[in-house]
Amino acid sequence: MADVLSVGVNLEAFSQAISAIQALRSSVSRVFDCLKDGMRNKETLEGREKAFIAHFQDNLHSVNRDLNELERLSNLVGKPSENHPLHNSGLLSLDPVQDKTPLYSQLLQAYKWSNKLQYHAGLASGLLNQQSLKRSANQMGVSAKRRPKAQPTTLVLPPQYVDDVISRIDRMFPEMSIHLSRPNGTSAMLLVTLGKVLKVIVVMRSLFIDRTIVKGYNENVYTEDGKLDIWSKSNYQVFQKVTDHATTALLHYQLPQMPDVVVRSFMTWLRSYIKLFQAPCQRCGKFLQDGLPPTWRDFRTLEAFHDTCRQ
């Protein structure tokens, strides 16, 4: 290391220059001490002035002498060679200004976004691997030529079993009334009334929930011929939102081997809307956002969230 530093540098002159710097600092300090002390130790004013001027001139001459000596030695020191390696310290001058090139913040944001995308993709992959998109008990990935064509088990349950499951669910929730009808044969249709908050039309095939429509408590749910209206939407945006969330819940609660558990889980989730207009958002703490109450209910905790706060 010493050999690298000594290239092109007179070390003896360098040492003398350091001593000259110290001498120059001492001379400058004496000048300021002289100015600070002022005129002293003389009886007459004229004598004090002459002594002060003489002492001040001597100090200035000392400063001038030491400065000339330092300039002379600085010429003898020489310049270090520019070829010695700086290693990583040579890259310090290449660092960009944070205000002009916010590269770090952009990379950090991209990294967080990529992490979040990977996390949600993993969750979606796990759910899709567990649940068949056909909502049947058939195994996925088997060639259609090799497996027999089986009827899904959820579509061949006897009506008595379906009635018994719905009756038990109706008794589980006192604030929820369920009216079952079969206007088109064996397929059941449910009219679920949740307190005085809303009504839900549930179209079923055996114990498989095919469609849900949520409407307000005072809205008409029947057509002109007295049948349940399974096509028209609610006139209120809040219940249209709840209908969309209920459709999402149908895709979430899927277990083809245990269809009664699926229906009970969906009804438990639907029951959480009993406080649709009373529960605040668990994230922002507000009751209204864009004129709407918290319409989303978490599938596990059943906590209320606004549609924009749940993400």
From Swiss-Prot:
Gene Ontology CC terms, in alphabetical order: core mediator complex; cytosol; mediator complex; nucleolus; nucleoplasm
Nucleus listed as a keyword: yes
One MF annotation (Gene Ontology) recorded for this entry: transcription coactivator activity
Subcellular localization, as worded in the UniProt entry: Nucleus
Modified residues annotated as Phosphoserine in this record: 132
Pfam families assigned: Med27
InterPro entries from the UniProt entry: Mediator_Med27
Lineage: superkingdom: Eukaryota
Keywords in alphabetical order: Activator, Methylation, Nucleus, Phosphoprotein, Transcription, Transcription regulation
Residues spanning the membrane: none
Family of the protein in this entry: Belongs to the Mediator complex subunit 27 family.
Subunit structure comment from the entry: Component of the Mediator complex, which is composed of MED1, MED4, MED6, MED7, MED8, MED9, MED10, MED11, MED12, MED13, MED13L, MED14, MED15, MED16, MED17, MED18, MED19, MED20, MED21, MED22, MED23, MED24, MED25, MED26, MED27, MED29, MED30, MED31, CCNC, CDK8 and CDC2L6/CDK11. The MED12, MED13, CCNC and CDK8 subunits form a distinct module termed the CDK8 module. Mediator containing the CDK8 module is less active than Mediator lacking this module in supporting transcriptional activation.
Protein name, UniProt field: Mediator of RNA polymerase II transcription subunit 27
Gene: MED27
